[in-house]
Design a protein with these regions (language model features):
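Alpha-helix boundary recognition
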Residues: 9-12, 19, 122, 132-133, ...
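N-terminal Rossmann-like NAD(P)+-binding subdomain of aldehyde/semialdehyde dehydrogenases
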Residues: 1-48, 226, 248, 256
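Mid-sequence acidic-hydrophobic segments that form the walls
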Residues: 21-28, 65-68, 191
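Short amphipathic alpha-helical/adjacent loop interface patches that line ligand
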Residues: 11, 15, 79, 101, ...
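ALDH superfamily catalytic-core signature
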Residues: 139, 147-305
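A generic "alpha-helical surface" signal
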Residues: 9-12, 16, 73, 95, ...
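Rossmann-like NAD(P) dinucleotide-binding subdomain of oxidoreductase/dehydrogenase enzymes
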Residues: 30-183
Length: 307
């Protein structure tokens, strides 16, 4: 379900992040055991007769739970700093996007990282829960849903483990009546369709000034309903295929897997049942030889603020 260009960019992005963390590792090493001025702090701390040095020690064993929408980047963003800081790392990739994370293990092996320093545990939520609850794991870094993140924080609290959470949400565009409507529609679609809409910065919530709501939604509906669907990116038979390969945002990409497709459709059905207007979309498109799990671009109108 990931556009080819996005996947290619992930490789170069992960390499760039690796270089960045390596540079910080050099700074960390250079500063270890350097003297800290005594007697000049607030309240005379530390006292002038103390010998104080700067030192940062590894945390120990860290559990790293990564997301499926950017599996290589998110995993590398966790693994690289953990190892460079001298920790042992256990990576638990998403069960629906684990192959690129397995490749990180090969890179670690080829680089000569000793056995047991970098490890991968595959599995679903039970594997992640085992990491969070383990008394041998001193820190958890998690990227994913807010609900799961809160549960991880609860699991780590009794053992006072460190926790780093990057949690999802519904990012909003706020549109006022002095805007160029065509530009607003184009910008909305770009965010809505990037990476198949499976990104934390997707413009999936519109807060529109009342005076322009109807006209904006009319334009948005027209543009969404004429979007092509991506087909097999290998054959590149039509515009949809070429757009997928080139990473353009004017084509509907599939979602990551069937369970995610069904989850999205269930949310739309729940909206219908609660009386929310489905302005366009809301189902599975009738496309020829679909190459993935598609959901029609969907607009829900007049959604309650507390939903």
């Amino acid at each position: 379900g990931k556009p080819f260009r996005q996947a290619k960019m992930a490789i170069s992005g992960a390499a760039g992040e690796g270089k960045y963390w390596c540079s910080l590792g050099a700074v960390l090493d250079a500063n270890q055991d350097t003297p800290v001025n005594s007697g000049g702090g607030e309240g005379g701390m530390p006292p002038a007769d103390w010998d104080v040095v700067y030192r940062r020690d590894p945390i120990g064993v860290v559990g790293l739970i990564s997301a499926w929408n950017y599996p290589l980047n998110v995993a590398f963003r966790k693994v690289a700093p953990a190892l460079i800081a001298g920790n042992c790392a256990i990576l638990k990739p998403s069960e629906i996007a684990g192959l690129s994370c397995m490749f990180i293990a090969k890179l670690a092996h080829d680089a000569g990282i000793p056995p047991g320093v970098f490890n991968i545990v595959t599995g679903d939520r039970d594997a992640g829960a085992a990491l969070a609850l383990s008394p041998s794991v001193s820190m958890i870094s998690f990227t994913g849903s807010s609900l799961t993140g809160s549960r991880i924080m609860e699991a780590c609290a009794p053992k006072l483990s460190q926790v780093a959470l990057e949690l999802g949400g519904k990012s909003a565009m706020v549109i006022f009546d002095d805007v160029d409507l065509d530009m607003a529609v184009a910008t909305t679609m770009k965010g809505f369709l990037t990476n198949g809409g499976q990104i934390c910065t997707a413009h999936t919530r519109l807060v529109v000034q009342a005076g322009i709501q109807d006209e904006l939604l009319k334009k948005l509906k027209v543009e969404l309903e004429r979007l092509p669907y991506a087909e097999d990116p290998i054959t590149e038979k039509d515009r949809g295929d070429r757009a997928w390969e080139e990473g353009k945002s004017d084509v509907v990409q599939p979602v990551v897997c069937k369970s995610q497709q069904q989850k999205i459709l269930s949310f739309i059905d729940a909206a219908r049942e609660s009386g929310i207007e489905v302005l366009t979309g809301g189902g599975v498109p009738d496309v020829t030889n679909p190459s993935g799990y598609f959901v029609e671009p969907t607009v829900l109108n007049n959604v309650p603020r507390d939903s």
